[in-house]
């Protein structure tokens, strides 16, 4: 009996020794595969370059060493918009040392294949900049808990800091934290991250404040290898304040040319100066969703906020929901590849625009020829002078690749149906705002009181009001209580307003006989 007990005990001890001795090596192989998949994703992304990788496999512990950096071309393209301190940090390579402990209890009592703790080593130049903000704290803490089935969980945190310069520039950052859970092979992953507060004080020029930022996503690969799923961006409050005027020039003509190839003069571009003021937006939210079935993708997005205060005026709520349906998946992948190529090269804005337009007309032409449908499900915006509402859809039917070079052919195969309802005073304000870039008043006349911009503004308001009244009389729109409503339809190249075919007035003809001597 004793012999049997001793033999059984020896068997248990041997089995335990085999398990606890062999399991770490087995799970070490599993951890190596997960990190190899992660390395593949890093190589495929359009933002980072992995300059080197080394993996040292051990029985109980392993080490992965990566040297990564932001792609120089991406930094060059965005460099003009970044402060020098940030450019210094982003332009230097970072060495990431992943310390891997593997075994069934690598994460303590919770069963796991491995636990990875990442150590970040920065160049001396980048380290000096980061130390000014974070002090002796590690700027980033990252751990990766690899599960028994090949999936896992990444936990990321960036510590808080309070930084101030003698110049009056100050940053108050309350940190960032969150996690990403992933499935085996990184075929899908879910992320949730939070940042409680960022307050940037730009000395006497203004300040920026963001409160309670939350970012989430649920992403997986579609059959065509599109990254589909959902995402969410939430911000409780955003405040912007500036003490100096800000000049702007929105190049709408270039946007129209990019989409339609029509050459339109710069006169349509809104230009001007935004005077010193403050903007506060509350409960800002942006959600997206995308899926694919049978090689066709459907996507939708919703943008909204509760309130926007600009100076002494309040706007909102705003609710915009749009969708794009029946989009060719392989065309979307072509656009994705082009955008990745653009990010990897040092290109001017014109070159980027030409590259995207070339792809849209060639490899991604299926986005137009696949009978897509663009929908505005809702557009509701409350203004101080009334409310805006719009809904409708635009579709292309039977377009060919050759049609993309002929606007008239495109229009014949375009169907649109939109409803608009907006306050007439808004149209007046838009005309006055646009006129600021087209008209000026002689300073001498303005000083003498014989002319002023207010005279021009009042003339424009009367012109808009007169045009609206004439169009209402002709049945092209409905005017009620200073609200303008109409329905815009395009079919077979024909435009209808309020159900009536729109006919522009003929230009007056002049001849030599009718001319004054």
Q: Which stretches of residues belong to each language-model region?
A:
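Positively charged n-region of N-terminal signal peptides that target proteins for export
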Residues: 1-4
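Glycine-rich, small/hydroxylated-residue low-complexity segments
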Residues: 7, 11, 19-517
């Amino acid at each position: 009996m004793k012999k049997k007990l001793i033999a059984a005990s020896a068997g248990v001890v041997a089995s335990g020794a085999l398990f606890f001795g062999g399991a770490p090596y087995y799970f070490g192989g599993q951890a190596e595969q997960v990190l190899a998949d992660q390395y593949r994703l890093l190589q495929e992304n359009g933002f980072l370059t992995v300059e080197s990788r080394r993996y040292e496999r051990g029985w109980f512990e392993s080490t992965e060493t990566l040297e990564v950096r932001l792609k120089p071309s991406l930094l060059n393209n965005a460099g003009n918009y970044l402060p020098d301190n940030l450019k210094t940090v982003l332009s230097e390579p970072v060495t990431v040392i992943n310390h891997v402990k593997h075994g069934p209890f690598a994460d303590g009592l919770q069963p796991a294949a491995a636990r990875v703790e990442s150590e970040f080593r920065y160049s001396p130049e980048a380290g000096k900049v980061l130390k000014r903000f974070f002090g002796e704290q590690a700027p980033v803490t990252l751990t990766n808990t690899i599960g028994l089935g090949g999936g896992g969980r990444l936990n990321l945190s960036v510590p808080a800091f309070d930084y101030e310069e003698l110049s009056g520039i100050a940053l108050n950052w309350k940190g960032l934290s969150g996690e990403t859970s992933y499935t085996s092979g990184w075929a899908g992953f879910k992320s949730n991250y939070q940042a409680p507060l960022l307050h940037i004080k730009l000395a006497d020029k203004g300040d920026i404040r963001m409160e309670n930022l939350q970012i989430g996503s649920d992403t997986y690969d579609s059959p065509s290898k599109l990254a589909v799923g959902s995402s969410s961006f939430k911000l409780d409050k955003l405040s912007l304040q500036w003490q100096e005027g800000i000049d702007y020039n929105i190049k709408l003509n270039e946007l129209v040319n990019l989409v339609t190839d029509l050459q339109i003069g710069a006169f349509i571009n809104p230009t001007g100066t935004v005077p010193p003021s403050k903007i506060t937006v509350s409960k800002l939210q942006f959600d997206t969703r995308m899926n694919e079935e049978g090689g066709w993708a459907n996507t939708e997005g919703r943008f909204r906020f509760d309130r926007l205060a600009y100076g002494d005026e309040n706007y909102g709520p705003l609710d915009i929901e749009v969708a794009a349906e029946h989009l060719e998946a392989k065309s979307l992948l072509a656009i994705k590849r082009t955008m990745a190529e653009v990010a990897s090269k040092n290109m001017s804005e014109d070159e980027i625009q030409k590259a995207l337009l070339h792809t849209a007309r060639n490899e991604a032409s299926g986005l137009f020829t696949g009978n897509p449908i663009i929908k505005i499900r809702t557009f509701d915006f409350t203004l101080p002078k009334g409310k805006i509402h719009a809904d409708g859809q635009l579709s292309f039917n039977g377009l060919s690749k050759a049609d993309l070079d002929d606007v008239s052919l495109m229009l014949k195969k375009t169907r649109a149906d939109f409803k608009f309802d907006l306050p007439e005073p808004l149209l007046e304000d838009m005309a006055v705002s646009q006129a600021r870039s087209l008209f000026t008043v002689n300073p001498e006349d303005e000083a003498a009181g014989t002319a002023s911009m207010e005279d021009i503004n009042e003339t424009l308001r009367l012109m808009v009001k007169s045009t609206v009244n004439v169009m209402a009389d002709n049945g092209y729109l409905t005017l009620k209580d200073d609200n303008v409503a109409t329905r815009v339809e395009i079919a077979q190249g024909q435009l209808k307003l309020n159900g009536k075919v729109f006919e522009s007035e003929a230009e007056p003809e002049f001849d030599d006989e009718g001319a004054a001597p």
